[in-house]
Amino acid sequence: MQINWLILDFKEINNFNLYQLLKLRSKVFVVEQNCVYQDLDDKDQKAKHIIGVFDNQVIACSRVLFEEGYYLIGRIIVEKKYRRKKIG
């Protein structure tokens, strides 16, 4: 299994991958984990995004923010069928 890892600023993410990334975040955080909160928090535009693409699909992602002298890693997710494969 060869995953293509992308590290991108928000403005560098193409529309196709952005849609898949947001869809995956909604699927995992809202549906699976029942975390009803505003995912779009205006921090994505300032973050670096680590995106794992396999078979032309976003299967993993996270974001890294630098705030007040610290790096914050968040929104870490892996598509359910790819978990427990040492991707995260």
Language model features by range: what are they?
Residues 1-48, 54:
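Short amphipathic alpha-helix that is part of the acyltransferase structural core
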Residues 8-10, 76, 81:
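Short strand-loop junctions, especially beta-strand C-caps/beta-turns
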Residues 82-87:
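Conserved acetyl-CoA pyrophosphate-binding loop and the N-cap/start of the following alpha-helix
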Residues 12-15, 67, 81:
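Short, surface-exposed acidic/glycine-rich loop or hinge patches that mediate macromolecular interfaces
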Residues 51, 56-65, 70-77:
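Conserved beta-strand in the GNAT
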